[in-house]
């Protein structure tokens, strides 16, 4: 079933353990070489008299490693192997010994380029999901912090972690989210979180507002968890999805958590006013220019008195396209 000869990175290593033929299967690049060397070296000293009768006893007595399990279902074995774990088959055993000594190519947890902060920690999420969960677990050492792992995608089988505080989260929201996740049937999360977001909240009408807040900072995600929100982590993505969210959440920044209350309120109010001005100033300007009699005398100086060859609405559209093109 496994294309060992066709795929160069799928490795099969045959050895003899206690007089029984055995085979290691693992993916090159996903396994810690030094750990595998120590495990295989320990098997060379096993004699026939020391060989247990079952795979469970073998994993408990002879495998010198912490994360060890046994699997008998073929689909589960294939899924674990393709996820990076090492599978050991021993002649005469009905189950496979699964050794989780995998490692992933990963960069350092440096500060995010697009989500910097003047104060606070300088670490950020990376593309490896277990590193991201560890960064949040380090900040919230509470048994109520739940990180539920699931898989989405028939081909990709992408790991998705649902993180929440079970004593603070809205249970109805959590139930609705789990129900939506179970109904997702896609071949793969090609664009990771963006694909997941589109599958979670499908709408038949156009909504320009974002449905999630994204952050690449573990401290921001941890703060949202403590507020009772849900954080979704997707493997191969260096950002977290936060829900529920609102327009007020979109004008928050990481610096807000580290400034005094007065400064925090001032910055949020400033961003809110700027957001409102961005939405309403341009259409109001167009409205008053087309109806000068409505323009208050205080703002009479902004009136366009010269004749223009291009209508104002087209001027604004050209300006918008020029700004977007830069």
Protein language model annotation of sequence segments:
Residues 261-325:
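Core alpha-helical transmembrane segments of integral membrane proteins
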Residues 1-280, 294:
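Membrane-embedded alpha-helical signal segments
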């Amino acid at each position: 079933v496994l294309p060992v000869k066709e795929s160069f990175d799928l490795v099969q290593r045959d050895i003899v353990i206690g007089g029984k033929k055995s085979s290691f299967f693992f993916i090159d690049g996903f396994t810690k070489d030094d750990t595998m060397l120590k495990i295989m070296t320990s098997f060379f000293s096993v004699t026939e008299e020391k060989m247990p009768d079952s795979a469970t006893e073998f994993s408990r007595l002879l495998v010198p490693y912490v994360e060890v399990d046994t699997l008998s279902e073929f689909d589960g074995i294939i899924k674990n192997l393709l996820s990076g774990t090492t599978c050991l088959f021993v002649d005469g055993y009905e189950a496979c010994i699964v050794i989780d000594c995998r490692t992933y190519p990963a960069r350092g947890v440096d500060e995010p380029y697009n989500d910097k902060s003047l104060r606070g920690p300088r670490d950020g999420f990376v593309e490896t999901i277990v590193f991201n969960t560890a960064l949040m677990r380090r900040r919230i050492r509470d048994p109520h912090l739940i990180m539920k792992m699931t898989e989405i995608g028939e081909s990709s089988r992408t790991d998705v972690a649902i993180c929440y505080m079970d004593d603070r989260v809205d249970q109805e929201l959590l139930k609705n989210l789990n129900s939506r996740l179970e109904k997702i049937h896609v071949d793969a999360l090609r664009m990771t979180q963006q694909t997941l977001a589109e599958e979670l909240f499908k709408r038949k009408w156009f909504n320009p507002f974002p449905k999630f807040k994204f952050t690449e900072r573990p401290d921001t995600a941890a703060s949202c968890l403590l507020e009772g929100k849900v954080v979704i982590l997707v493997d191969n993505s260096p950002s977290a999805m936060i829900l529920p969210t609102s327009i007020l959440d979109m004008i928050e920044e990481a610096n807000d958590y580290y400034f005094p209350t007065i400064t925090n309120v001032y910055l949020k109010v400033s961003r809110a006013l700027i957001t409102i001005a961005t939405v309403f100033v341009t259409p109001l300007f167009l409205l008053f220019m087309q109806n000068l009699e409505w323009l208050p005398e205080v703002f009479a100086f902004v009136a366009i008195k010269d004749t223009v060859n291009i209508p104002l609405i087209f001027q604004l559209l050209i300006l918008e396209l020029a700004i977007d093109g830069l």
